[in-house]
C-alpha cells in the first residue's frame, strides 16, 4: 500500500528508492507491504510511521490495482492521507521531494506507480483537503 501526503501548498510527497534496493534512484509514493493479517489502513499507518516518522490519522482509499513485474504480480492499495502530523523525513535512507501535481508525469516514478499519477491528476483535490504541515 502507499499514501499520498499533501503539504499546505498542495504538493504531494514522493520518495526516492535508496542505493542497494531494487530500482534504486527511482521515485515512488511512500508505503510498503502489509504484515500477515494486517488491514490496508493499519499497514499504511505503520509504514508511513516507519518510513517517514509521520502519524497518519485518517485517509481514504483512492484505488486498488495490480501491477505485473517479470517475476510476480502485486496488488497495490493507494490512499489519500487526509489527516497527518509530523515532519516527514527519510528514516530508511530515502530522499524526499514535494512535487506539484502537474509535474508528477515528468518525474522518474516507478511504472507500478503510474496509475496513481493518473488517478491523482483526475481528482479535484483543491487546497486544504488534507491536513499536515
Predicted regions and their residues:
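A conserved beta-turn-beta hairpin within the catalytic core of GNAT-like acetyltransferases
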Residues: 22-25, 98
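C-terminal structural segments of small proteins and small subunits
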Residues: 86, 101-115
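Short coil/turn segments
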Residues: 17-20, 54, 109
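Active-site-adjacent beta-strand/loop module that shapes the phosphate/pyrophosphate-binding cleft
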Residues: 7, 55-56, 64-89, 95-97, ...
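Charged phosphate-binding loop/patch that engages nucleotide di/tri-phosphates or the phosphate backbone
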Residues: 112-133
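The catalytic Nudix box helix
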Residues: 29-61, 100
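Conserved N-terminal beta-strand and adjoining loop/helix that marks the start
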Residues: 1-12, 33
